[in-house]
Amino acid sequence: MLNFFAAAPKGFEYSLAQELTEFGATEIKESVAGVYFTAPLALAYRITLWTRLASRIVLVIYKGPCESAEQLYNAAYCIDWSAHFSNRNTFSIDFHGTGGFINNTQFGALKIKDAIVDRFRDDGDARPNVARIDADIKIDAHFRNGVITIAMNFSGPSLHQRGYRSTTGEAPLKENLAANMLVRSGWKAAPTTLLDPFCGSGTVLIEAALMAADIAPGLQRSRFGFEHWRRHDKATWHEILEEAKARASLGVKRCDVKFYGSDIDSRLVALAKRNAQNAGVLELIDFKVANALNVEPPAGEGYLITNPPYGERLGSVSELLQLYYQLGDKFKKEFGGWKVAMLCSDIELISALKLKADKQMKMFNGALECAFNLYTLHAQSTRRDTPVLPEGVDIADIAPAFANRIKKNAKQLEKWAKKEGIDSYRLYDADIPEYNVAVDRYLDHIVVQEYMAPASIPEAVTKRRLSDVLLALPAAIGVDPHKITMKTRERQKGTNQYQKLDERKLELITTEYGAKFKLNLTGYLDTGLFLDHRLTRRLVGQKSKGRRVLNLFSYTGSASVHAALGGAKSVTTVDMSNTYLAWAKENFALNDLSGKQYEFVQADCLQWIRDSALDKSAQYDLIFIDPPTFSNSKRMEDSFDVQRDHVNLLGMLIKLLSPNGEIVFSNNKRKFKMDTETLAKMKIKVENIDDLTLPMDYKRNPHIHNTWLITHA
């Protein structure tokens, strides 16, 4: 008997142990990401050829305690390597695990390599050569918790590579993951009609057809790890291969299971057909190009097993939620008696099906953790948490309170916005506590920002509510789902407001009181324009004529644009970010503003203020400053807290202000308290102007910011 380890993705252990038991392996023991077992050589060959779940089979040669480099060397040296491969063979070592005396895997691999070549030399043979690529023999070593396991890769390249895939689709599903979906769904135990309406490159259907037609998944592989092993029994292997070929030929002829696959992408359907042809099962599968929402169930009952799109890219979530909701509705109405098994990485999406799962499992698609849910669709399946919607009822009724509120807000604000001369404004700001989101309109696009929920509310509840919001929005305010972008906003910490989210850009040009600004709805947490400061920017513009204007913590320079359009004598725009200064320059160009009177300065604003306060000639007539609530950026010398530091900050700013000048000071700290007493002693006059700077669309949230007009006393 030989000792083996079958490696597999996390979550496969139970299924793999069951498969090995069915093969006849013994001493089966589940471990992390794999299963140990023993088997005679012939059975090991059969398992390697027929396993549908394992990623790799390794022959365990040594396993024992290891507490020093010397012990590691001795463990490898004591193995009679010449019994496993010739010195004419090349070899490589994959070492996994660190800890204790092993600081890095390269050190461990080097020790084992030295032991192997020394053993060959001491036995009177020439040393074998190491090959980093395509070695004849691959040694796998694992060090964990003071135990070293040394093994030989018995199966060769990853067993999920069956050999039938020509190229992959955009998001390929690994073959052994598809096989595990078929096993855990219950389909493999009783093969029946199978439908995949998001078939992509056909992996689920092809794996199912291979099972139903009794075709060994490794039959088309061109290489196995044991081929250069000295104990390889070519005759036994040939016999097992020929038996598998005969079973495959007979199995295809006898298979009476019906398979149906469709995808909206004709290129993927063509690819699926090529893959099925390569696998020898094309005649068993009916492929067609179709929208999943238009696919009709085949006659009778069966299984629908699929891996639908779950869009990892920001901004596609609303459209996908609509798709999942419509799928759930279709399943309920048209697939009575069927079983559905669905793999998805996003709990919000899969919950949008509004179906009660019989079973929920975890699987990993590569490093991506996914939910694998099983559903039984009874003739009168009901939606979870929601009454069945009668014909003609709007989808918004799944969140009626939210839908009614935002519909009312939108109706009121649309006329106001047109009159104001703006096309970007806030529609909803957590008006109903259960729906803790902000919804902003930017022309014909919508941005939904989720606020961080209190810790007392279960995550599943917040996700369901967010899902309902995104489902209700299109019907409630008449917006296309693909024009809804979703973002998650937490309480501001340091420079969170500048966190980059996505390389993809969705850029628009918005108009505000005659000024034009570039927006990026997807690249950053904020879009490039703080809508709550709309009136503050207009106020800056109104106060700027003939004045020298300074804009600090300028972000994308929108206040600077208003100042320039308002007739400022000069405008100095200061921000630490080159990205935002470049954006500010674009905003100036959009408004046909150019000239030496417009200066852009990249600097740590606090340090720039300190330095400028020492320069008596640095005088400004109007200063606008909107500092972060808190910042500890690595590029800033010190941390900044607006409550703690505002007196010191204003004390420096007043030195930059001309005798009749004004400072417009704003911040977003909700419980900010201006230290008027200390400032008065410094001969600084302070006036709160919140009433002048709170726009109508923010009246529901009067603490969104606080604004002050500051002058010399």
Curated annotation (Swiss-Prot):
Give the matching InterPro entries.
23SrRNA_methyltr_KL (IPR017244), RlmKL-like_Mtase (IPR000241), RlmKL-like_Mtase_CS (IPR053943), RlmL_1st (IPR054170), SAM-dep_methyl-trfase (IPR019614), SAM-dependent_MTases_sf (IPR029063), THUMP_dom (IPR004114)
One Pfam family name from the record? RlmL_1st
Q: Give the EC number(s) listed in the UniProt record.
A: 2.1.1.173, 2.1.1.264
Provide the reaction this enzyme catalyses: guanosine(2445) in 23S rRNA + S-adenosyl-L-methionine = N(2)-methylguanosine(2445) in 23S rRNA + S-adenosyl-L-homocysteine + H(+); guanosine(2069) in 23S rRNA + S-adenosyl-L-methionine = N(2)-methylguanosine(2069) in 23S rRNA + S-adenosyl-L-homocysteine + H(+)
Domain of life here?
Bacteria
Q: What is its main location?
A: cytoplasm
Q: Which molecular-function annotations from GO does this UniProt entry contain? A: 23S rRNA (guanine(2445)-N(2))-methyltransferase activity; RNA binding; rRNA (guanine-N7-)-methyltransferase activity
Top EC group:
transferase
Q: Spell out the subcellular localization from the entry.
A: Cytoplasm
Q: Keyword annotations for this protein?
A: Cytoplasm, Methyltransferase, RNA-binding, rRNA processing, S-adenosyl-L-methionine, Transferase
**Which stretches make up the THUMP domain?**
43-154
A Gene Ontology cellular-component term? cytoplasm
Q: Do the record's keywords include Nucleotide-binding?
A: no
Outline what the protein does: Specifically methylates the guanine in position 2445 (m2G2445) and the guanine in position 2069 (m7G2069) of 23S rRNA.
Protein family per UniProt: Belongs to the methyltransferase superfamily. RlmKL family.
Task: Read off the PANTHER family from this record.
Answer: RIBOSOMAL RNA LARGE SUBUNIT METHYLTRANSFERASE K/L (PTHR47313), RIBOSOMAL RNA LARGE SUBUNIT METHYLTRANSFERASE K_L (PTHR47313:SF1)
Protein name per the record: Ribosomal RNA large subunit methyltransferase K/L
**Native source species:** Shewanella sp. (strain MR-7)
Organism placement in taxonomy: Bacteria, Pseudomonadati, Pseudomonadota, Gammaproteobacteria, Alteromonadales
